[in-house]
Amino acid sequence: MTGSTVSRQENSPKRPNDSNGEFKRLLVPETSQPEEDELHESPPENQILNVEEDRDKTYDSVPPFSWAKLWKFTGPGFLMSIAFLDPGNIEGDLQAGAVAGYSLLWLLLWATLMGLLMQLLSARIGVATGRHLAEICRSEYPSWARILLWFMAEVALIGADIQEVIGSAIALQILTRGFLPIWVGVIITSFDCFLISYLEKCGMRKLEGLFAVLIATMALSFAWMFNETKPSVEELFIGIIIPKLGSKTIREAVGVVGCVITPHNVFLHSALVQSRKTDPKEINRVQEALNYYTIESSAALFVSFMINLFVTAVFAKGFYGTKQADSIGLVNAGYYLQEKYGGGVFPILYIWGIGLLAAGQSSTITGTYAGQFIMEGFLDLQMEQWLSAFITRSFAIVPTMFVAIMFNTSEGSLDVLNEWLNILQSMQIPFAVIPLLTMVSNEHIMGVFKIGPSLEKLAWTVAVFVMMINGYLLLDFFMAEVEGFLVGFLVFGGVVGYISFIIYLVSYRSSQSSSWSSLEMSERVVSTET
């Protein structure tokens, strides 16, 4: 250890060796310090996994890597990865393959890496503070901004949920050979809110086990389709390695990038990581947890990338350059596959339906889970989990039922609806990403785990790029859809308010003095300096 480091450590105030409650008070703005009993409640014990086998040991550096411990940390990243595999993403994949062939696979890879960066920052804020993003927003922003952020998050979640529930309903319709109409599928799917409540009571590992089965089902289904259709491996690798973007594929490219950041997923991941018991007072333990979550999340998104690649390649092989390419969508994709590749021992239509059902069910359950954290975090509501799940589910099921009944027989109408829902979710991205980057780069919130200048610049660059891509999509959509002076005037007024709120969020900084400032230097010593 260098002499200057020792000097800083000796002259700096010692980190408080106090109770967990007092430590949490350091993380809350001084002007809004809650009483001990008002601090957020920890999850029930059966939802927290103890990962510290050697909790009695004291480490001067990050504990050594352990495969057994990595296994214990495995779970939250795979739940997070579901948002990269929802029916909206699957539809984006199939349309990208049908319209652009293999040429956008490089963009799919880089978009997944950008999404990984944002999710790692979400995990970082959850582990380092012991609170999830919605809770931190509640304590940091003024009431009006907090309520508006909650509303935006709920709107994005409802939009995503409608897509996911309809995706599951379409899958059920396929698997029952049209016997179940879409609206009946919506009713069946709505009961998963009670399933998640039951699995939560059984333990976090049971819930994670369900998602492991659903992800494996998707992987096997779409891998089987990939093997059955035999896409060109050479063209596939060229598409991954060589960037190529034609004027006719810009819309599909925007769709690929726009799907990588799902607003509710940013809030969800910061809460999921708290299912592993990590003491925020132990700097080395926190760093250890972040290391394991980085490995686990990277592995999870590698799996999601491969599943998305399988779907894109299957439709690139079957429909690129055909007359069906411009009309293919989630509703008719299975029938196009059946017409193209026939039946066989395992008809491809049903394999597609099974994969789509797994995608829809897994994403609706994670959406319900995210809704609980968003509502309880922003509004500080304490209620039974089943009731919270039911309320959250109702926000989405009621409009979804209306949509399913209205558009049950019209494939074209469902495609138009899906386009509107993509626009709705794209509009909400800034209201998840900007608070995340603001908080994770704030020393008052993060202490020694505040991200450095280089990572902060990279994160903001990625965020601005994704928001610009979605801004292009919004502009293109509204220019095509908005007609008339009155409608145009109302849209203009909405855009002004929308941009004003974004500017407020970007320029916002906590006015509270840092509770960590006097402690940072003493904690900046890590194992590499010894």
From Swiss-Prot:
Keywords: Ion transport, Iron, Iron transport, Membrane, Transmembrane, Transmembrane helix, Transport. GO terms for cellular component: membrane. Residues 1-53 are annotated as: Disordered. GO terms for molecular function: metal ion transmembrane transporter activity. It is found in: Membrane. Seems to be involved in iron uptake. This is Metal transporter Nramp5. Residues 11-27 have a biased composition (Basic and acidic residues). It comes from the Eukaryota. Belongs to the NRAMP (TC 2.A.55) family. HAMAP family: NRAMP. Residues 1-10 have a biased composition (Polar residues). The keyword rRNA-binding does not apply. The chain crosses the membrane at residues 65-85, 98-118, 147-167, 179-199, 207-227, 253-273, 299-319, 341-361, 387-407, 429-449, 458-478, 485-505. The gene is NRAMP5. One of its GO terms (biological process) is iron ion transport. It is a multi-pass membrane protein.
